[in-house]
Structures are given as C-alpha cells and as structure tokens.
C-alpha cells in the first residue's frame, strides 16, 4: 500500500494571510492530482463537531446496532455460502437526510428532536463551507466567482444537498465483504466528517490504494463526477472505498453538495480549448445522469460519460437529418 505522508492536508487559515498563494496552489494540486484532500481550520466549531459525533454514535447504539447485528448475521451466512454475493454487499449501517431543495429530516423515524436540530445546524455550516470551497475552485480555475454554485442551481434555483450518516461496525470477516465497495461519487463536492480513531477509507491513486488519514476535527473533501465534467477533466473524481475493520466502529457523516435535478451539466466554455477536435465530456441533465449512476455505481465512470456522449451524437444526427 502506498504511503499516506503526502496526502494533501490544507490549513484554511492560511488563505487569509501572506501564505494564501501557496495554500491555493496546494488546493489546486490536490484537486488535479488527488481528487481528495483534508482541510483544517475550516470554520466549523469543534464543539459542534464533538456534539454531532457524540449524538450520532449514541443514536447508532440506541436505535441501529441491534438491527445491524441481525443484518450482519444473515450477511455473513450468505457470504460464506456464496462468495459472488458477498462481493456485492456493504458492511455498513446508514440513513440519509435530505436538506435541499426540501428537508426530510422531520420524516425520518427514530431521530430524537435534539438530534434533528443538531443535524440541521451542522448541515447549514457544511452548506456554507461547500459553497466557499467551490468559489476557491473557481478562483484556481480562472472562472468567475459563483460559476460553480450557479451551474449547480439549475433552472429551479437550488442545488441538491443531503447527508449520508454511516456506521461501519467491527467485521469478523473483512476478507469476505467490504465496508463500502469502490466507486466514484456521482455529484459535485463531498464533505466528510469521519471518525478520528477508526480508519478504513481509501482512495485509488496511481494504481494503489492509499489510506485517508483520520484527523481530529478535520473535514475530508472529495470531488464528484460533475466537477470532472464542468472542469473538462482538469479536476478528477477518484475511486474510493471503505475497508471493513475487525476492531472499532467507524463513524462517517458524508454531505453531498450536488447539482439540482434539473441542472444542465457540461464543460465550462472557458475551460474548453478551441483546438479540441473531440469533445471530452458530454452535456446532460443531472437527474438523467443519476438514473444511469444508480445502476452502475460500483463500476468505472468512463462508460457513463461515453453513454451520454453517444446520446448527444445520436440527437445531433437526428437533428441534422431532419
């Protein structure tokens, strides 16, 4: 396994001082060459993060642990009987909260009111941070401020924003199942608050799996497929996975700031060179991309892009014939 010492960690405090150019260069390099980075001093209070961690772990213990143990027993039995089936299972307990365009947190069962209020506060902080990061990316890309958030909002004027809350309990057979199988994320920019004592998250870089180091009060950021398309491939989404662990229960709170379902996604014209004879990335509606993604999530992203390029070509040919 590749060493983790060079994994990009960015101190956002440096963006306010004389070291801003170096920090922006580090951010640009992380987006170009890693698709992942970790940020410190990001503006979300450590007290809020500690409270979120405590209540999330308490919620799992109180509500979800027994359900997961029942699932785990069945999963291991099926996996032992059928290895091919085990390869398609994920060793995780999850629930999903939608924040935008409309929140569903009031409808999720088994959440106490204090936890609901806390998650709404945390989501508001993460939304602000996501938009701040997108503007920093615009600056590095030479795009006007707000270009990416505007592209994400679509005709309806709102992005899609939600949080996946996951627990990865100890697994007695990590040789049999993954915590979460390898995939790229379909959307825009993903902000992860992960456990600082139990690892397992890995990304694929230069053909090797690299550990994403757990760091207290950090936020891990990764780029989704939509940013790869909009940046015309300058920034990349990256395959990542969670490896099941024999010890410890890993907490993961991943918030996805994605385009609105009606947003039309295509490379930013400013990032497409005039001499490009072949269009590298397609144009599509985000909702259509998601329909394809859910069927092929755990596969390479390139065939998804090619499928939409083929659709574009067919449409253009029909128009030309008409």
From Swiss-Prot:
Induction: By flooding. Its cofactor is Fe cation. It catalyses: 1-aminocyclopropane-1-carboxylate + L-ascorbate + O2 = ethene + L-dehydroascorbate + hydrogen cyanide + CO2 + 2 H2O. Signal peptide: none annotated. GO terms for biological process: ethylene biosynthetic process; fruit ripening. Pathway: Alkene biosynthesis; ethylene biosynthesis via S-adenosyl-L-methionine; ethylene from S-adenosyl-L-methionine: step 2/2. Residues 159-259 form the Fe2OG dioxygenase domain. Fe cation binds at residues 183, 185, 240. One of its GO terms (molecular function) is 1-aminocyclopropane-1-carboxylate oxidase activity. Its EC number is 1.14.17.4. InterPro entries: DIOX_N (IPR026992), IPNS-like_FE2OG_OXY (IPR044861), IPNS-like_sf (IPR027443), Oxoglu/Fe-dep_dioxygenase_dom (IPR005123), Plant_2OG-oxidoreductases (IPR050295). It comes from the Eukaryota. Keywords: Ethylene biosynthesis, Fruit ripening, Iron, Metal-binding, Oxidoreductase, Vitamin C. Pfam families: 2OG-FeII_Oxy, DIOX_N. Belongs to the iron/ascorbate-dependent oxidoreductase family. This is 1-aminocyclopropane-1-carboxylate oxidase 1. It comes from Oryza sativa subsp. indica (Rice). The lineage of its organism: Eukaryota, Viridiplantae, Streptophyta, Embryophyta, Tracheophyta. The gene is ACO1.
């Amino acid at each position: 396994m590749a060493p983790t010492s060079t994994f990009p960690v960015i101190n956002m405090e440096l963006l306010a001082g004389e070291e801003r150019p170096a920090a922006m260069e580090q951010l640009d390099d992380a987006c170009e060459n890693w698709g992942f980075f970790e940020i410190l001093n990001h503006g979300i209070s450590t007290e809020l993060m500690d409270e979120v961690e405590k209540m999330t772990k308490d919620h799992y213990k109180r509500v979800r642990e027994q359900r997961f143990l029942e699932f785990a027993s069945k999963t291991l039995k099926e996996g032992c009987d059928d290895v091919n089936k085990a390869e398609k299972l994920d060793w995780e307990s999850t629930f999903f909260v939608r924040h935008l365009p409309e929140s569903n947190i009031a409808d999720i069962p088994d959440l106490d009111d204090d936890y609901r209020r806390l998650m709404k506060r945390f989501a508001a902080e993460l939304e602000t941070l996501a938009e701040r990061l997108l503007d920093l990316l615009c600056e590095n890309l030479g795009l006007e401020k707000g270009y990416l958030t505007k592209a994400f909002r679509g005709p309806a004027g709102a992005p899609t924003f939600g949080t996946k809350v996951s627990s990865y309990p100890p697994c007695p057979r990590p040789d049999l199942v993954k915590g979460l199988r390898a995939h790229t994320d379909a959307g825009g920019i993903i902000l992860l608050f992960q456990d600082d004592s139990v690892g397992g998250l890995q990304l694929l870089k230069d053909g090797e799996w690299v550990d994403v180091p757990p760091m207290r009060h950090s936020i891990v950021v990764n780029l989704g497929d939509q940013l790869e398309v909009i940046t015309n491939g300058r920034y990349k989404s990256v395959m990542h996975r969670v490896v099941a662990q024999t010890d410890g229960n890993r907490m993961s709170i991943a918030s996805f700031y994605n385009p609105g379902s009606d947003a039309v996604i295509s490379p930013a014209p400013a990032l497409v060179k005039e001499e490009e004879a072949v269009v590298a990335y397609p144009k599509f509606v985000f909702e259509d991309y998601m329909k394809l993604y859910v069927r092929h999530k755990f596969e390479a992203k390139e065939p998804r892009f090619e499928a939409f390029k083929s659709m574009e070509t067919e449409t253009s040919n029909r128009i030309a014939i008409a």
